[in-house]
Amino acid sequence: MNNLLLVALGGSIGAVFRYLISIFMIQVFGSSFPFGTLLVNVLGSFLMGVIYALGQMSHISPELKALIGIGLLGALTTFSTFSNETLLLLQEGDWLKATLNVVLNLSLCLFMVYLGQQLVFSRI
């Protein structure tokens, strides 16, 4: 299958997952903090680490990288939404939540990419 179609398919799946996860997190935790965006970014970062590590070991096809790594995870995770939500918190004067949002997204996402890679590398 054409890689462009795989990216589009993965992107549509990732966007739907992001929407459903965000709605679920608002229902569970309310909307005072962007937990949905945090969760999709952390989960997506972990999966990106796994995909990257598998790709480094040639255990994943270029087609699967396009479908999952670029399409699904590209649509699932969202830096633009993270940035907008952080700016809204700042504009509301909630510096603590804005700072927490930045620190949690960056530190947890970096850690999850690392964890995903280590999980794969330790199994081989």
Curated annotation (Swiss-Prot):
Signal peptide: none annotated. The keyword ATP-binding does not apply. It catalyses: fluoride(in) = fluoride(out). Its main location: membrane. The chain crosses the membrane at residues 4-24, 35-55, 60-80, 102-122. It is found in: Cell inner membrane. Keywords: Cell inner membrane, Cell membrane, Ion channel, Ion transport, Membrane, Metal-binding, Sodium, Transmembrane, Transmembrane helix, Transport. GO terms for cellular component: plasma membrane. It comes from the Bacteria. Na(+) is not transported, but it plays an essential structural role and its presence is essential for fluoride channel function. InterPro entries: FluC. Na(+) binds at residues 74, 77. It is a multi-pass membrane protein. GO terms for biological process: cellular detoxification of fluoride. One of its GO terms (molecular function) is fluoride channel activity. It holds the Pfam family CRCB. NCBIfam families: crcB (TIGR00494). Belongs to the fluoride channel Fluc/FEX (TC 1.A.43) family. Fluoride-specific ion channel. Important for reducing fluoride concentration in the cell, thus reducing its toxicity. This is Fluoride-specific ion channel FluC. It comes from Shewanella baltica (strain OS185). The gene is fluC.
